Amino acid sequence: MLFDKDGTLSHSEPRLIALADARITEALERFQAMGASESELSELHDLLARTYGRCESGVTPDGTLAVASRQHNLLSTATVFCQMRLGWPRALVLADEMFDAVDQHHQDKSSTGNSTALLPGAAAFLRELKAAGVVCALISNDTTAGIQSFIDAHQLGDCITDVWSADNHPSKPDPGAVHGLCTKLNLKASHCALIGDADTDLLMARQAGIGITLGYVAGWHQSPELTAHEHLIHRWSELTLEGRSNKF
């Protein structure tokens, strides 16, 4: 069983709201120091908010921040800076510096013991799968360190056999990410199920030949609109194991 992390097992929206706001604030401060006018700062704020999927009620579940990797978000940010009339080399350097500064702040906060909460029922289902002998793994666009921190914080190390992160190549949503993880697990993709909260995950799974694709929609304030699933899950308690066959 292959699991996405953010928005599927992890209640990530509060952390992503804070991350989006921190990146926007950092960008505004840097452009202000460069002499940007109030109208330019307002334009930059709106462009970044739309780019990250930051809305009044939270983060859109299919937005760049929620779905894409850090590198893809960095490139999206640099593209916004180009719209603010910076050249690409300067925009890319500025985005990289901005992301590093915000990441350091969030790393300092996470070292104080703050951790993203598990979604209701996720831990119980993982332990049920472990007890039944089902191999479980995480496939995420978070870093390896971020995934391991999540596993350690919730004491899931005995439930998770392996991970595939943004540090692995190829990363999601390339179907090769699924093949790479299945190779590490010594399993055929057709013998696995994948559950995620984004169509990019589910389409990737189908293209990789995954046996069952499950869409999960309860991880966000606004339910994601999924189309590439075989089954749709609204809460973890809807999933049960059938007898000794380990089928869902």
Predicted segments with their positions:
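Asp-based, Mg2+/Mn2+-dependent phosphohydrolase catalytic module
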Residues: M1, E29, A123-A131, T144-F248
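N-terminal helical cap/lid subdomain that shapes the substrate entry/recognition surface
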Residues: M1-P120
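Short, flexible loop segments at the rims of nucleotide/cofactor-binding pockets, characterized by
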Residues: T112-A117, N141, H169-P170
